[in-house]
């Protein structure tokens, strides 16, 4: 009987450790699904955000001039470079997910509501309009 109680306690402790997740577990550098950008996710005050730290096509044809955020709907932001643009903002952690955030897509200049879910070394990032039902999920990989 003592062995059963001990084994049950060990199993419960192990399962709790496996299924519990730190809110900061999402922090780090991620490679997007297309493998053409790396995004660093960090904590800003009590929320999580992410900025572009590398892109495959960072420069214009001349190889020197950094590409700009030319498709941004806000004309005042079109002159900023793609590098270091904050594309994830406002995420809060709730029960294994990062929710209530926004994701900006510099390829089309649009911002969407977003949520994220961590699964091992992959991050499911869902952008949507209105309800999460009406959206698209991409899977990012953690960069070691």
Question: What do these predicted ranges mean?
Answer:
Residues 1-22:
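Bacterial Sec-dependent N-terminal signal peptides
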Residues 21-30:
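Cleaved targeting-peptide boundary
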Residues 30-32, 100-106, 125-128:
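Short beta-strand segments that buttress and anchor functional surface loops
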Residues 32-49, 53-71, 75-93, 117:
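Short, solvent-exposed loop/hinge segments that bridge or flank secondary-structure elements
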Residues 35-38, 109-113, 134-137:
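Short, surface-exposed coil-to-beta transition loops
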Residues 42, 102-122:
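C-terminal/domain-terminus segments
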Residues 55-57, 104-108, 129-132:
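Short, solvent-exposed aromatic-acidic interface loops
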Residues 120-122, 130-144:
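Edge beta-strand at a domain terminus
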């Amino acid at each position: 009987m003592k062995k059963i109680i001990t084994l049950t306690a060990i199993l419960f402790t192990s399962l709790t450790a496996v299924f519990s997740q730190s809110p900061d577990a999402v922090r780090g550098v991620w490679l997007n699904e297309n493998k053409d950008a790396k995004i660093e996710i960090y904590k800003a005050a009590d929320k999580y955000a992410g900025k572009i730290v590398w892109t495959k096509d960072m420069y214009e044809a001349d190889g020197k001039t950094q590409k700009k955020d030319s498709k941004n709907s806000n004309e005042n932001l079109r002159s900023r470079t793609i590098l270091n643009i904050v594309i994830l903002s406002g995420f809060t952690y709730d029960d294994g997910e990062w929710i209530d955030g926004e994701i900006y897509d510099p390829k089309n200049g649009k911002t969407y509501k977003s949520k994220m879910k961590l699964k091992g070394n992959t991050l499911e990032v869902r952008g949507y309009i209105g309800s999460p039902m009406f959206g698209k999920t991409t899977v990012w990989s953690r960069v070691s």
